[in-house]
């Protein structure tokens, strides 16, 4: 893998999400085993609660997008094309808050715990505020990156 260079690519280059479904602001760190991104809830967004915050359950999607950034950057630095993947599930998503306040940046960290050649993987993910080690949310995500996403979807209709 080529050594990561700054600045990192824009998250829109690494994820298939567009418009209001792209919840991450930028990449702040990358290693072979982990990615760190920033996300800032917006008060007027589609998900905003009565106080303008982001409900904590959306933290799961923030984590999934952080995993996608990690895989996307790994492909980027290896000179490989981007591929779609899927979130299979999570084990015990825990949040210390009911919502993430609008306008307050958060650090979303996704660390690869396991990855096999078939594309099956597991990531330990956390959400916190910059400079504050107190966790706002944490979970283990199970993910899958099929070799041929379109064939996978055809074989596994919803």
Walk through the language-model features, giving the residues of each.
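Polybasic, low-complexity association/targeting segments
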Residues: 1-8
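Compact, glycine-rich, soluble single-domain proteins
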Residues: 51-70, 84-85
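HotDog/MaoC-like acyl-thioester-processing domains
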Residues: 3, 69, 99-107, 111-158
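A generic structural motif
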Residues: 28-31, 94, 114-116, 145
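Catalytic strand-loop segment that frames the active site of acyl-thioester-processing enzymes
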Residues: 19-55
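Small-residue-enriched segments and motifs
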Residues: 22-25, 88, 108-110, 139
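Short aromatic-glycine motifs in intrinsically disordered, low-complexity regions
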Residues: 8-18
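Hydrophobic beta-strand-centered segment that forms part of the acyl-chain substrate-binding groove
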Residues: 69-107
